[in-house]
Amino acid sequence: MTENTKTCLFVGLAAAALAIAMLTQPQGIDQLPDDGDSGNVFFPDFEDPLAANKLQIVEFDEDKGQAENFEVASSSAGWFIPSHENYPADADNQLEDVASMLIGVTKLGMESEDKGSHKEYGVMNPENAKPGSSGVGKLVRLAKDSDTLAELIIGKSFNAPAGIDSTRTLYYAREPGKDRVYSVDLRNVDDISTKFVDWVEKDFLDLDKWDVMQVHFDNYDFDETQRELSKAKRQIGKYTLAYADGNWTSSDLNMAEGESLDKDTLDALRDALDDLEIIDVERKPEYLVESLSKGNEFHDVKNMPQLQAIAQSLAGKGFYVGQRPMPGGQVALEVVSNKGEIHVGMKDGVEYALRFGEVYLGQETDENATGASRYLYAVARMNQSLLEAPVLEPVPAPIPPQKVPPSPDGNATAPTPAPDANATAAYEIKRKERATEIARAKAGNAGKQKAYNDKLNKARKRVGELNARLAPWYYVISNEVYKKIHLDRKDFVKTSEPIKPTSNNAPR
């Protein structure tokens, strides 16, 4: 969160807190239980949302019979999610919702002082809940390091009495460790989630479908018992499609008569790439992360134990270390997958390599209503062929030096005839004109080359920024999205039905 964002957040929260306080002042409160504590703020000392560096939400899942404990914490590098190996959190909106709830939240009226009524009001502490528990609330806690700034157990909702505003929804709530249950006015309660997907930037590729220029499908199966790629990869199909001006084309499909590209399917592919959302993540081994940040998966691998650790991690997700023979008896290592890969080329020269791994069945399976999810290995790289190389203008040769005619008798000691003044003047004019042409061509070419080099440097920088985010993680995507982007020829090539002859055009 930038300083400007923090400032705007603080100002917005101050206004929200004031509005809530005004709405919950004494008018109409006499229709709620009044114990003399009504109208007081729960957390009078908690006024600065920027003071919190830890947010904890605990919610009881009755179906699973266990509490879901979700935590977001901040460091100098930003907000992260400890439960998911410190994956970066996109927490601004969520934090605003939570802080808006707890800053200035007022006790509208006391409902009960009886600990035995907590179940009835739905404010049982989820941290103490056990399988079979009911009436359990949602615990929201903001803290600074080990110091709790504000915490509240939010229970059942109910319609506000007519004296307040019957269109508003109120909640029962209490502070952990205290028996009193109060009615409170809280907003955005349903938006406070313990689900990983609600706290991260879902568009993790940061890919704009309007910048897609080329898609290459490399569909293959991998025999993990083999290590040499020429033996291990069973090629199913390789297809390259270009996209420009709203149309798809391909020069290597060799389509038969009646075949054409299915624009709807390919447009859905572009949409799916743009909407490629995370379901879960798992961290890669540090050897692999460090190497990827330098442009190659095996850049920093120095010994066999490191390579074995990487290979073991990859294999568990459906990715493998393949070997490609190189000149001089050398071997190049390469990451491959058991479900092929797709390369997405962008207008700026960046290419995404997306490799598809094994089916994933993890703790976020309830997020994926369409069925099994799948591991995805994503890396960015530069593809210079995506950028149009500059067409340089030929630079003309300089005018050769003016020739001096030899002496008539060939005697080297004879005086050299004086050059013709008119010829010399004409030569100088041509020489200067040519020099101007040369300078203009060189300057134009230099400008074109600089513009091209700037694009290359920008692409390299973009690749570095993307891999800094992508390198540490195995991603998990939904099976529904996987089916939209993992296409074979039969999926995006359609066959037109032959036109049946009618009585008017039937052969005679």
Can you say where each PLM-predicted feature lies in the sequence?
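Secondary-structure "cap/kink" motif recognition
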Residues: M1-R508
